Amino acid sequence: QRQNELLTADYDLKTHLADQEAETLLVQDVDQALARALEGMCDLLSSLPPLTDESSSHERYRMLQRAKMLVAYCKRKGSLTLAQHGESGFDRDRIQLIANELASDLRTIDVDCASIIAIRRPMHASTVSALYDCVYDFAFFAYTTDHPALMYHLGDHDRCSVELRAALFSNDDADLSQTPAAQELESALQGRNVAYRL
């Protein structure tokens, strides 16, 4: 009996410590992401061209829209640290709600977006955080294209991982994989803790 109580207490302690470590890592990840996004917003705002003609007006508009995307990213990413408390994970309905909010954010900057969420198991906040990063990486890439439509599917890959598939449709004639924005996308994905293929 005493041995069982000790084993249970040991298990509970290890679980609590693992949860604390995961929470600490998530807070650090979110903190670093918000710092990078804030730096990006400051860079954008400090480099706005003066309003001299229609071309500069259009360029300012595009840059301000990009800053708006960064604000939305910060809002969604920061909410993860609050959303994880007292929760057993992010289930399909909760992820679908997040995806709908994200799609709504993107539509306000003329990136048409739709998603299918087909996960069967709840996901940890750190997984959702990595998915946010990847979806926004694709969204920033999509914003560089002509009349973009971004579609993505999130489903279970195996018992321990999920798979995010994204497809971008645009009116561009050029090969988008050869653009500087595509190189930025690949560089961003390389910096994430994800396996990917473009």
Region spans (language model):
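Conserved signal-transmission helix
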Residues: Q1-E23
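Conserved short strand/loop->alpha-helix "switch" segment adjacent to the catalytic nucleotide/phosphoryl-transfer site
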Residues: T15, D19-L25, T108-A139, Y143, ...
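Conserved DHp (HisKA) dimerization/phosphotransfer helix of two-component histidine kinases, i.e.
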Residues: Q32-I116
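Conserved ATP-binding N-box helix of the HATPase_c
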Residues: R36-P49, H124-H153
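Short beta-strand/loop element within the Bergerat-fold HATPase_c
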Residues: S55, M151-R165
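Amphipathic alpha-helical regulatory segments at dimerization interfaces
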Residues: E101, D105, D137-T144, A188-G191
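Conserved DxG motif in ATP/Mg2+-binding regions
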Residues: C160-D173, L198
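ATP phosphate-binding glycine-rich loop and adjacent ATP-lid/helix-beta elements
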Residues: D172-L198
